[in-house]
Every structure is written in C-alpha cells, then in structure tokens.
C-alpha cells in the first residue's frame, strides 16, 4: 500500500486517522483494524477486527 494514501483515507466509522501496522490500518479511536489485501485497504466496518484485548 502506498504510504501517501494515509494522508487521504480515514476511518469509515469515525473519520479519524488510520495508522499502518503490518498488513492492517488501525483506528485507535474505535479500536478497529482494517485489513490490507494485495496492497488494497478494505475499509468496511464489517471486515474490521476489534483490537481490544478481552
């Protein structure tokens, strides 16, 4: 994924900043990680994984 995209895209849920961590885009506000598949970010809430430890 191109790093320059991070300046353009935002979390689809809260419109907050996303951080690239390995193969995921992480929203720290919502504690969601969106997958990046074949260099394409999948910014669907239904595809996101909750990163909170239970």
Curated annotation (Swiss-Prot):
Segments passing through the bilayer: none
InterPro entries tied to this protein: Trm112-like
HAMAP family in alphabetical order: UPF0434
UniProt family annotation: Belongs to the UPF0434 family.
Protein's recorded name: UPF0434 protein BCI_0256
Organism (species): Baumannia cicadellinicola subsp. Homalodisca coagulata
Lineage of origin: Bacteria, Pseudomonadati, Pseudomonadota, Gammaproteobacteria, Candidatus Palibaumannia
